[in-house]
């Protein structure tokens, strides 16, 4: 963005030169050749040109011989102050003939919107006043603040000392009192005020909010308070009746757009507004557009565009909000949070699929169909959510498939919605093949009854403690019955280490025939017993696996035991079994 455009313009020629068009502007002043945003400002214009001037006094009502408001040839209306003709017009605005003091007349120019002022000038058609005050408003005329004063007697008119030659003594700009305009040889005079004269040297507009506020105005007012007199400045009776006359009121400035626009336009209602760029909006480009709030709004400078950034929502949201805490945590890079993510997405950036959907790896994240429904089977799946990456639904025991829609190998469909797939049954031993008859069962085993507490001493006496799931009915193998099992967890193992995975549980045939232990397919059990079996071809046809013989304990599994067994396992590893 160009540096601060100071210019103290003292003659009509220099005023015209400042407002004349310069070299051709680039195609898009708000972006460089590569399309990157950069700070930009509208050109310097006469903000008062063609604007209505509100004068507190104008001659012609009632009509006189020299001034008649109803006759265009003899009218001296305030419109002559800002007409496009400027100094070329032979007519001047003229106040009424003021018969007595105070001889105050005000000229107010509403600019239509906020401008950043550079200068104010006014040409007088008669001897210039000896006392003039310049005021500005930032709220369209509701309140006023002084810009500067011009007087031949600053202390008398405004109670101020004359302006020092090197500008304000303080750190910021202030309204100073300058010498009154001098009369020209032709009897006219020129009031020329530069905003630079009221500001300390070296103050940069880009980095000084105080200076930005100082030069901002929506209205400018010129107050003519005392005509020029040859004698005592307090003796107004010597000049009455008196009439002020002036023309060519100029307010040089730039449309205030905070560095985010290179021009101002009229909206549909005829109001002057900035043609905002960089994702900004508003009459002065003073805020970010609704979806451009990934970082807070800032005024553009010559070094940094501070463009408002669109929220990163991957095309799945139309609204977002700014979160300062997230912005700080990101190193002041991003603070946007997407709202109402569409297309089954979720997250701050709509970057993952919502519950019940998963990412389609064959589509881009910005694709409207990037998230596919899990479509988990209502009976075979244990829930409606699936893995966000693979789409795999959580299946019930014995169920398989991406959507849990079929039974796993070795399982068959049941009529139960709780357990839709059960283990395919394997024929067990018959009475003819069993060496023990039911009436002999009491001599073989007594099933465990009631509650059972697992103490450290009992835990340490067993060669192994494992959780198993029975896969099918037992199969007779000589003096033994073999049950296919899956070892789900190992809490203690013997010399030949028990391992998780598929295995076999060997039960003496006599005990198995009496239902001791009673092992049902699809159920889980806690097995506390002897060590791992011998190699294949062992006694009585027993193969490798686990043994549930006399001295072993088989209990229906309870989930509450897991924590207790893990605690006993840790105590064993610390050597507590030796003490027990």
UniProtKB/Swiss-Prot annotation:
An MF annotation (GO) of this entry: RNA polymerase II cis-regulatory region sequence-specific DNA binding
Primary localization class, coarse: secreted
One GO CC annotation: Golgi apparatus
Residues annotated as domain Laminin EGF-like: 255-308, 311-371, 374-421
Domain NTR: 441-577
Disulphide-bridged cysteine pairs: 92-125, 255-264, 257-274, 276-285, 288-308, 311-320, 313-338, 341-350, 353-371, 374-386, 376-393, 395-404, 407-421, 441-514, 460-577
Domain of life: Eukaryota
UniProt name for this protein: Netrin-3
